[in-house]
Amino acid sequence: FVGFKAGVKDYKLTYYTPDYETKDTDILAAFRVTPQPGVPPEEAGAAVAAESSTGTWTTVWTDGLTSLDRYKGRCYGIEPVAGEENQFIAYVAYPLDLFEEGSVTNMFTSIVGNVFGFKALRALRLEDLRIPPAYSKTFQGPPHGIQVERDKLNKYGRPLLGCTIKPKLGLSAKNYGRAVYECLRGGLDFTKDDENVNSQPFMRWRDRFLFCAEAIYKSQAETGEIKGHYLNATAGTCEEMIKRAVFARELGVPIVMHDYLTGGFTANTSLAHYCRDNGLLLHIHRAMHAVIDRQKNHGMHFRVLAKALRMSGGDHIHAGTVVGKLEGEREITLGFVDLLRDDFIEKDRSRGIYFTQDWVSMPGVLPVASGGIHVWHMPALTEIFGDDSVLQFGGGTLGHPWGNAPGAVANRVALEACVQARNEGRDLAREGNEIIREAAKWSPELAAACEVWKEIKFEFEAMDTL
């Protein structure tokens, strides 16, 4: 007699516990499960809980050396998805001790690791995570957060304006710096390295950093406003990434940038710590997110990637536009925008928020709206995102018929007009076009922009619906 019963047994006997009362310290997950035909939902949900925590495909002798009751993940609820015949939401609770403190990497390796290749499931999607304060408190979080950023930049009561420098690849460092200068002097707060711009043969990073710093200081002197350019520190190794951040700090610029998904959470968290220690703001780009979050039935919803970024650390993150050329349905986008900015977010299924999330005192992240937006979108963007956001117009600045600086002027005038109209109590949703038209009478730059983009729309159904 060996002391345990060998063999394969149903996961649901151990891992499906509908009576379980979740603890305040548990990490809770909501999975959208599509079982293979013939697999009951309880078994599928239990399999997810097992394979993402303590379980394996057969009972093992070493199970007797630990306490499964203390360490196992539990599927504590299953509900069918309305309008889908073979999809279920499985709720799984994970004991806190399964995770290394302060490591988004470890959290994801467990929760969205091997289980996503599991044969008994046709597809699996992580819709939301509840991060308990007991776990979130082990993370530094954003280097500075919204309030500190406003204080550093001395900009209040309005969204911030940015612009990605295009053409994204092929400019020399000197011409790139020139484009940055024109945008900043025209009235933008920030310009941005495209996420593809790292250090390529046509423009090495050190040269770009130098010419961009020159553009920042020249435009600051001219306008009397604090300016920034997101210098992309993303690199092939962590050491090289930190070296770039160090050079940015030596130049005295206010902000650097990182591609957090392609760069990886470990690198991102290291950079976020460096940024707080050295007074740099950190702008986060989400290149690769659509690989993970675009399919409705498999992968991870962006709200999970957004929560993970707030823990790993970043002061800005791209979050869709609701109105431009990229994905995003309004209520769902606003749901994760609140998860990024607010301290306490109530469960609200209509906005895709499966759990109440309490961030306690972790700083917030500014959502960045970027992609296919222009002056006519300004009232809608001001209305949807409010003051705590960064609105980024790449083509919408550089595509201006008179050049970058007038393009920047047009955007700044449009923004100031919208903010003023809102503060006067006007309804931006209804009177938006009128507000822009009025402002254009006083600004030839804005009038020219209004002329160019009057008809542009990207009309497709959003895929990210509930």
From Swiss-Prot:
This entry's Enzyme Commission designation comes to 4.1.1.39
Q: Please write the reaction equations for the catalytic activity of this protein.
A: 2 (2R)-3-phosphoglycerate + 2 H(+) = D-ribulose 1,5-bisphosphate + CO2 + H2O; D-ribulose 1,5-bisphosphate + O2 = 2-phosphoglycolate + (2R)-3-phosphoglycerate + 2 H(+)
One GO term in the molecular function aspect is: ribulose-bisphosphate carboxylase activity
Q: From what superkingdom does this record's organism come?
A: Eukaryota
Required cofactors, per record?
A: Mg(2+)
Residues with PTM N6-carboxylysine: 192
Give a yes or no for keyword Lyase in this entry: yes
Which keywords does UniProt give here?
Answer: Calvin cycle, Carbon dioxide fixation, Chloroplast, Disulfide bond, Lyase, Magnesium, Metal-binding, Methylation, Monooxygenase, Oxidoreductase, Photorespiration, Photosynthesis, Plastid
Keyword Lipid biosynthesis listed? The answer is no
Q: What residue range is the signal peptide? A: none
Give the residues annotated as active site.
Answer: 166, 285
The record's subcellular location field reads:
Plastid, Chloroplast
According to UniProt, where does the site described as Transition state stabilizer lie? 325
Q: Name one GO biological process term.
A: photorespiration
Which of this chain's residues are annotated to bind Mg(2+)?
Answer: 192, 194-195
**What modifications follow translation?**
The disulfide bond which can form in the large chain dimeric partners within the hexadecamer appears to be associated with oxidative stress and protein turnover.
UniProt xrefs under HAMAP family: RuBisCO_L_type1
Q: Which family does it belong to?
A: Belongs to the RuBisCO large chain family. Type I subfamily.
Q: What does this protein do?
A: RuBisCO catalyzes two reactions: the carboxylation of D-ribulose 1,5-bisphosphate, the primary event in carbon dioxide fixation, as well as the oxidative fragmentation of the pentose substrate in the photorespiration process. Both reactions occur simultaneously and in competition at the same active site.
Further information in the entry reads: The basic functional RuBisCO is composed of a large chain homodimer in a 'head-to-tail' conformation. In form I RuBisCO this homodimer is arranged in a barrel-like tetramer with the small subunits forming a tetrameric 'cap' on each end of the 'barrel'.
Name of the protein: Ribulose bisphosphate carboxylase large chain
Q: What is the lineage of its organism?
A: Eukaryota, Viridiplantae, Streptophyta, Embryophyta, Tracheophyta
What gene is it encoded by?
rbcL
